[in-house]
Amino acid sequence: MKHTFRHASLFLVLAGAALLARAEEISVAVAANFTAPMQKIAADFEKATGHKAQLVSGSTGKFYAQIKSGAPFQLLLAADDETPARLIKEGDGVTGSAFTYAIGKLVLWSPKPGFVDDKGEVLKAGRFEHLSVANPKLAPYGLAAMEALKALNLADALQPKVVLAESISQAQQFVTSGNAELGFIAYSQIHKDGRIIDGSYWLVPARLYSPIRQDAVVLAQGKGNAAVEALTAYLKSPAAAAVIRSYGYDR
């Protein structure tokens, strides 16, 4: 019995060593709004598979430019569905690999309790100096924000107060630092485990902007990579879906 136990233990050790030997580290470009949930998903993924996902956060537009310039990313989690489709068309993404991993929601937010009402009337009142918005040329959430302002017929009136950020993450930083009293950001940035972290907000009605379908795509440098394939499969799993929903996204 002891002899059998020793053999079983040795098998488990060797199997674990083999798993670690096959484990890889991959480079993943992640849309700024999805940073927090992806950090959680990446940690769970590493525990489950041994593979490590090295995350780089930023704006989708900036990632597109970097990928076109040869940046060594193997997987892109974009903040839209157009960029992955474009990369596939241009030969920088793997055909058939794109899929929607999350559907985002836009909010108007301020860290000050009661500053933003639940109908967004604060925008019409205009009693603020600066409104933070991610650059619509770089960030899909910034484009959604401008679409919402146009739908409300407020784009022209509020344009002088708009402060453009490079990414949705920076748009939030402008508000938290006091450079803007309020700003348009992703719901996920203030939502965790079914509750709002702080401040006051208006959940912008989906009818005011185009759907924010966030797609992932395997990039040319990740084609055939076992770790990349494992991560894309994990992103589609119920475990990942639970994390994604806990941050306020739809699937």
How should each PLM-predicted stretch be described?
Residues 96:
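Active-site phosphate-binding/coordination module
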Residues 19-23:
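Sec/Tat signal peptide C-region and signal peptidase I cleavage site
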Residues 1-12:
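Bacterial N-terminal signal peptides that target proteins for export
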Residues 24-57, 61-71, 78-81, 85-91, ...:
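Exported/periplasmic ABC-transporter solute-binding proteins
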